[in-house]
A protein has these predicted regions:
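Cation-handling catalytic/transport regions enriched in His/Asp/Glu
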Residues: 1-184
Length: 184
């Protein structure tokens, strides 16, 4: 029923079941092994949610930037190293004041990318505090923004939005694709 209701036509129920089986047979055992290693290295009998973010070597959290401008400049260098077009798109966000990244009193929590339909320029919102996670979030949201730039030429507004099954593909892929450039 849901396949018909959601107008899904590019993959089948059998594809979903096969994907589930693949995760169960390949990813689950790897996750269990990693969890066991984490438990052992932390000297715990049982892992709890708050144990998952702890560095098992006891290293302090990374502080890759002090000022938001440093993060923006670093991300720009990363994107320009990957592709002139990506770098130019990212710089366009800054030039058009479409990056609201500084934390400040009274600012809503979270991070997101929002496509401004009239100007057809994405807007990125987050609360940067100098952490590695902030850099990852910026790159993730930039992935959404790049997807918006590339779909912005479409005439109908509804064609510019990605369906829920695809919405995170561009952003999560951008996180992975940028890894080789993080020394920039």
């Amino acid at each position: 029923y849901m396949f018909a209701a959601m107008h899904r036509f590019d993959y089948t129920i059998d594809d979903c079941l096969e994907f589930h089986d693949s995760i169960e047979s390949v990813c689950q055992p790897l996750r269990h092994k990693n969890d066991e290693d984490r438990k052992q290295k932390l000297g715990l009998e049982k892992l709890r949610p708050w144990d998952m973010g702890v560095d098992i070597r006891g290293r302090p959290p990374l502080k890759p930037f002090k000022e938001v401008k440093e993060m923006v400049d670093g991300c720009s260098r990363i994107f320009h190293s990957m592709s002139k077009e990506l770098g130019d798109y990212f710089d366009l966000l800054e030039a058009n004041d479409c990056l609201d990244l500084d934390s400040r009193k009274g600012k809503a929590p979270g991070g997101y990318q929002y496509y401004l339909q009239k100007s057809r320029i994405p807007f990125i919102f987050m609360n940067a505090a100098g952490t590695q996670r902030n850099v990852e979030t910026m790159i993730h949201e930039a992935g959404h923004a790049f997807h918006s730039f590339y779909s912005g030429h479409l005439q109908l507004i509804h064609e510019r939005d990605a369906p829920i099954e695809f919405a995170e593909v561009a952003s999560m892929s951008m996180e992975l694709l940028t890894h080789p450039y993080w020394g920039e």
